[in-house]
UniProtKB/Swiss-Prot annotation:
Catalytic activity as recorded in UniProt: 1-(5-phospho-beta-D-ribosyl)-ATP + diphosphate = 5-phospho-alpha-D-ribose 1-diphosphate + ATP
Pathway(s) per entry: Amino-acid biosynthesis; L-histidine biosynthesis; L-histidine from 5-phospho-alpha-D-ribose 1-diphosphate: step 1/9
KW Transferase (keyword) present: yes
Gene name, Swiss-Prot/TrEMBL: hisG
Annotated source species: Anaeromyxobacter dehalogenans (strain 2CP-1 / ATCC BAA-258)
EC nos: 2.4.2.17
NCBIfam families: hisG
Highest taxon, organism lineage: Bacteria
Protein's name according to its UniProt entry: ATP phosphoribosyltransferase
Cellular compartments annotated: Cytoplasm
Taxonomy of the source species: Bacteria, Pseudomonadati, Myxococcota, Myxococcia, Myxococcales
Length: 221
């Protein structure tokens, strides 16, 4: 059994992904980060029987923790990875946290006059800019971090780029999806230095999770 200093640190995001990823870890290794972390004020919990330490942090920060070596492994949405590319090894699509980054406009909105740059409200500054640039559209990107769906109704933007799971919030705000930008799911990411320092232990972790993902997928079919 590894000592405390030898545990592999896994950064798991708070919220829905913590619950979904916990099911995979429980299936793969018999440990649940959600169960270990719940009922405590601490943001870290050890599972020495699996050789792991789990830390619970904000979803948008997981990639930074792993890239800079504060955690060896993490779970990150593909939207985060494509918005701000990182020097990380991405060995596995976990098949959880499925959503779509989309372009949406008010239902029944008239097309903008030719030559008029659309005002696009979004938290995905890079993804949105690349998407419209690829279409040859000189969009004005308006950075927002919340309540993006109301921007068109308040006259702040003509269009939004946002992430959605069911589209219900979009419909409730009178918006319709025009395009899909990126299909999103959570990915397992690994620090590249850690991969050289602990190749066998990380390989076993990756393969155990890979088998759990395949098993969960087979059951869902």
């Amino acid at each position: 059994m590894p000592g405390t200093s030898e545990l592999i640190t896994v950064a798991v995001p708070k919220g829905r992904l913590l619950q979904e990823s916990s099911a995979l870890f429980e299936r793969a290794l018999g440990v649940s980060p959600r169960k270990l972390l719940e009922g405590t004020r601490k943001l870290a919990a050890d599972a020495p029987e699996a050789g792991l330490r789990f830390i619970s942090i904000r979803a948008g920060d997981v990639a930074s923790y792993v890239e800079h070596g504060a955690a060896e492994v993490g779970i990150v949405g593909l939207d985060v990875l494509r918005e701000e590319p990182r020097d990380l090894y991405e060995p596995l699509d976990l098949g959880i946290g499925r959503c779509t980054v989309i372009v949406a406009r008010p239902k029944g909105a008239r097309p903008l006059p030719r030559g008029v740059a659309p005002r696009v409200a979004t938290k995905y500054l890079s993804l949105a800019a690349r998407h419209f640039a690829a279409k040859g559209v000189p969009a004005e990107i308006i950075p927002l971090h919340g309540s993006i769906e109301v921007a068109p109704s308040l006259g702040l933007a003509d269009t939004i780029v946002d992430i959605t799971e069911t589209g219900e919030t979009l419909r409730a705000n009178g918006l319709v999806i025009e395009e899909k930008v990126l299909e999103v799911s959570a990915r397992l990411v690994v620090n590249r230095v850690a991969l050289k320092l602990h190749p066998e232990r990380l390989r076993r972790l990756i393969e155990a999770l890979r088998a759990a993902v395949a098993e969960a997928g087979a059951e869902a079919r």
